């Protein structure tokens, strides 16, 4: 806030990068133009900000639809594997709700029967409560074919539970998590560092950014990676089989919002 209030310095172009989850509704960003300053809000959609504020978002709908489709397809021949569990850090967070919707849509489209969603906390603290995630899995019990942990740092509790208590098939999040636990069959990859590098490179080069940008499956910045130990397994075949439909559903989803 102090940075935004400071007078501009001649010949200086400043950049502030902020997480939209914490700052998208920050009052100071709703004020007047920022002059030569730029603010980049990541994990944020829309362009209802003054000149100088830019947003980008890695869409979670398509890649989550893809993940849900794989889980639904892998459960189609067994009533013992027809339920899946989504553990989310908090309710009413747009990125998480988009992921939950995509995952459940894909799961049901491939014949899954029951997708349950549980929330770890009421606010953003849910992203940093791995011990609580560990305990919550213990309370929920077994019987779910695949856990989708939309938890940020709290996902560490899910992986630890699968190692120490009950081997629970799990989807890795953000990076390839196959080295953390053998319970990870595949991981949803979000190449946030690569996108940030692209934006910063363009800024240094003096290139103009799009005011707002959503990057989905077709962009390559979100993806699914099968755990290396399963690369020759039927799981890898199912992941590839579900890709094309997921890309199309992602495109339809983004188009429907405009």
Residue ranges and their predicted role:
Residues 1-258:
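A residue-level marker of the well-folded mature domains of exported/periplasmic proteins
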């Amino acid at each position: 806030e102090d940075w935004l209030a400071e007078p501009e310095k001649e010949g200086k172009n400043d950049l502030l990068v902020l997480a939209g989850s914490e700052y998208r509704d920050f009052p100071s960003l709703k004020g007047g133009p920022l002059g030569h300053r730029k603010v980049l809000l990541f994990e944020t959609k829309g362009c209802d900000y003054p000149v100088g504020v830019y947003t980008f978002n890695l869409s979670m709908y398509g890649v989550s639809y893809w993940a849900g489709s794989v889980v639904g397809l892998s459960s189609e021949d067994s009533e013992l594997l027809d339920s899946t569990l989504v553990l989310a850090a908090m309710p009413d967070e747009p990125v998480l709700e988009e992921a939950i919707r995509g995952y459940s849509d894909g799961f049901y489209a491939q014949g899954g029967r029951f997708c349950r969603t549980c929330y770890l906390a009421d606010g953003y603290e849910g992203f940093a409560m791995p011990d609580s995630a560990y305990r919550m899995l213990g309370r929920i019990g077994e019987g779910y074919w695949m856990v989708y942990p939309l938890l940020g740092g709290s996902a560490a509790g899910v992986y630890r539970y699968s190692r120490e208590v009950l081997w629970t098939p799990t989807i890795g999040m953000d990076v390839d998590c196959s080295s953390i636990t053998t319970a990870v069959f595949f991981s949803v990859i979000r190449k946030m560092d690569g996108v940030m590098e692209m934006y910063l490179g363009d800024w240094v080069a003096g290139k103009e950014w799009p005011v707002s940008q959503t990057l989905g499956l077709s962009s390559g910045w979100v993806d699914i990676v099968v755990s290396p130990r399963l690369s020759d397994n039927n799981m890898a075949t199912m992941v590839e089989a579900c890709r094309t439909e997921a890309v199309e559903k992602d495109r339809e989803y983004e188009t429907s919002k405009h």
